Amino acid sequence: MINKIDLPSAQPEEVRKEIEDVIGLDASYAPCVSAKTGLNIQDVLEAIVEKIPAPEGDPDAGTQVLISTIDYNEYVGRIGVGKVDNGTIRVNQDVVICNHHNPDKIIKTKVSKLYEFDGLNKVEVKEAGIGSIVAISGISELHIGDTICSPENVVPIPFQKISEPTIAMQFMVNDSPLAGQEGKFVTSRHLRDRLFRELNTDVSLRVEETDSPDRFKVSGRGELHLSVLIENMRREGFEFAVSKAEVLYHTDENGKKLEPMELAYIDVPNEFAGAVIEKLGQRKGELRNMGSISGGTYTRLEFSIPARGLIGYRGEFMTDTKGNGILNTVFDDYGPYKGDIQYRKMGSLIAFESGESITYGLYNAQERGTLFIGPGEKVYSGMVIGQTGRSEDIEINVCKKKQLTNTRSSSADEALRLTPPRILSLEQALDFIDTDELLEVTPTNLRIRKKILDPTLRKRAMINKKA
């Protein structure tokens, strides 16, 4: 099925050819549809009936169910979801679990509850046969890729290995001066329980405890993967802080450093192609292919680029292409380390004093760069309140009030015009933070801050780093 043909840049015939060339599948029959508008959906339903074969298997053979996803419920625990490939599965049936991660580990257990799906709802059943998509609860040791077998037929089903994490972030308890004021769950126990609970449903996530009980290393398959987790936790009422993403390196048999490489597929209007090529070149990207699409108005670029080269780039990409570019990435392989990358060339505007931002103070600050906050917002010393136009950080007092005299009155502040602040989204904030900064995440606010809040200690740390 080829979706989104309602878009101006849609090229269904080119996509058919790419599917055949890259994947090797015959795409000549693939329906061209628009899920958004409902165009040609009837063709999809007819193709399902015509092209997809009925389930095959031996109903008299031993039970075989391959677990393809994991759900979680606080009342019943882990719920394994998979398709019955052979035999039948029944409630209270004795079964054996073939562990995908440890083939020598065989677990004997019993099916306590069995469900089939009716739309988005689970319906409890007594048994299910070949082709049924079932949910099985009561087995705490289930993992994606495991096979549930009958004891007399312990034969695991081959499973595609899930790709390993490529980047990591530090999740930590928020210790800023505003900590605990906006979140419902703020302690290290809350944070730990939530992160380890996520492992029940997200098999590509890794959570490790560190030498500090208030800090956890969380690894995932990219910035987007971890940003979804952060946003979900934020909406649930959690308050915490995260560090800048860092790449997970490997070493080869000769001890040489290897880094994760991504394939980036980019569609941009022709006038922006040069800027994109330049930026990705600075980030150690290698242009592999370039062509014209959409009747010659768009350029398609294919890059091989280190995963760390994409950290913080999506925001720049949308700015450089004025929102008209499309960027898709996929993990390729581990390759030789490409060398150092200069991530951010602009410094931060840092609040010098704690308090409430004042129009007068912000008016003076906006001459130094782009502001992230407006008047009347809580700030603290060491909090990043904007971006400078230069490479170094600048400390500034946005809580500063104008001294009143007989000829100066507070009403004169009304004549000061502030440029509207740049409000960062979660993805933009994660892109912006530098290695010496943290992102403070609460249900109501996103604040960027320096890891070391005290200006004297921060300067001393910078001197020691350069020494």
Annotate the PLM regions.
Residues 4-9, 35-40, 71-74, 86-89, ...:
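Conserved nucleotide-binding/hydrolysis micro-motifs of P-loop NTPases
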Residues 19, 146-149, 217, 223-239, ...:
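Charge-rich, low-aromatic oligomerization/scaffolding segments with amphipathic character
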Residues 23-144, 148, 246, 264-267, ...:
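Conserved catalytic-core segments of large NTP-driven translation/proteostasis enzymes
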Residues 154, 162-292, 308:
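Charged, conformationally dynamic linker/hinge segments
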Residues 4-27, 46:
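GTPase G-domain guanine-specificity segment
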Residues 127-130, 134-155, 159-167, 173, ...:
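Internal insertion modules embedded within essential enzymes
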Residues 85-213, 235:
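Catalytic P-loop NTP-binding/switch module of NTPases
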